[in-house]
Structure formats: structure tokens, C-alpha cells
């Protein structure tokens, strides 16, 4: 009986829940300062993120911490989640990327929805943008906007007002 209890304790010692205190994103591998559920502080824990994805969570987010070989001196954070900001109501199979400001990209069953939360959306470092579809625009369309260009509306007014 004692052997089973010992094994149980050892297995439970391999994984833990924690609360994020701070994150340092200055190095190649992000590090996280956490407080384990029992109040045990751990500083500089490596956060192993999936290739191609990175995020810097807010203080108060939750983390899952692994202790390889049960060695509590060398922990790794394998996931960080923040239920305060998680999008709700996704349908089965839908996927979203989101932040604490309400910005999101959601792959829905009807199509892709980009929500800029009232902020500018900027596309960078591309020679052109190509849209192989009809465009429906509810706001103004302006060309050469950084050098005093003109709007489509202004061009229409000039064209419609032209007489021969």
C-alpha cells in the first residue's frame, strides 16, 4: 500500500497548476515567474511555445507547469491560458486567435472574421495585396493616403460633375 501512495505522490509531483506573476519576452525562450497553487514561487521558468506562435500573457493568467523527472528545480511551462479573455460561443471546429483588448481573428463556419476592436489593421512588407473577390466597403477608399491622395467618393464627384 505504501508503494502505491509513493508512486501517486511522485506522479502528482510531475505536473502543477500555477498563476502567472510576470513574463520576460527578452530572450530566445520566454521565461515566466509563477506562483504554484500551494503558493510556491518559481522564477525564470522556461515557457515552451508551439513553433510559429508566441504570446505574452497578462499577470494573473493560469499556467500548466511540468517538472521533468519530478525535479522541482527545473520546471517548464507548457501552456498559459487566461479565462478572463477567452472567446466564448465558438462552434465545433472553429478556431480563434484573440487578446485582452478584444482583437481577434476567428475561423468560423461561415468564413474568416477579423475584429480590430476599433484599432487600425496594418498589412506590412508586401509588394501588393491581391483580393480575388468582390469588395464591399462601408467606409471611404483613399489612394496614396500618405501623400495627400484622394478618395473614391471625390473621384466620383469629379467624374459625375464633368461636362463636355
What are these regions (language model features)?
Residues 1-109:
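Exposed beta-strand/loop interface patches that mediate assembly or binding
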Residues 60, 105-107, 112-152:
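Low-complexity, small-hydrophobic/phenylalanine-enriched stretches
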Residues 159-163:
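Hydrophobic alpha-helical segments used as single-pass signal-anchor/transmembrane membrane anchors
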Amino acid at each position: 500500500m505504501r508503494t502505491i501512495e509513493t508512486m501517486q505522490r511522485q506522479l502528482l509531483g510531475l505536473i502543477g497548476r500555477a498563476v502567472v506573476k510576470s513574463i520576460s519576452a527578452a530572450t530566445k525562450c520566454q521565461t515566466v515567474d509563477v506562483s504554484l497553487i500551494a503558493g510556491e514561487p518559481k522564477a525564470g521558468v522556461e515557457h515552451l511555445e508551439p513553433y510559429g506562435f508566441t504570446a505574452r500573457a497578462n499577470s494573473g493568467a493560469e499556467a500548466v507547469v511540468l517538472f521533468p523527472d519530478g525535479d522541482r528545480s527545473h520546471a517548464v511551462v507548457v501552456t498559459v491560458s487566461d479565462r478572463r479573455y477567452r472567446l466564448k460561443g465558438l462552434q465545433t471546429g472553429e478556431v480563434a486567435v484573440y487578446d485582452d483588448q478584444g482583437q481577434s481573428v476567428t475561423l468560423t463556419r461561415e468564413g474568416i472574421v477579423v475584429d480590430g476592436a476599433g484599432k487600425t489593421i496594418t498589412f506590412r512588407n508586401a509588394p501588393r495585396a491581391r483580393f480575388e473577390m468582390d469588395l464591399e466597403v462601408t467606409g471611404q477608399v483613399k489612394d496614396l493616403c500618405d501623400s495627400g491622395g484622394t478618395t473614391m467618393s471625390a473621384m466620383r464627384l469629379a467624374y459625375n460633375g464633368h461636362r463636355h
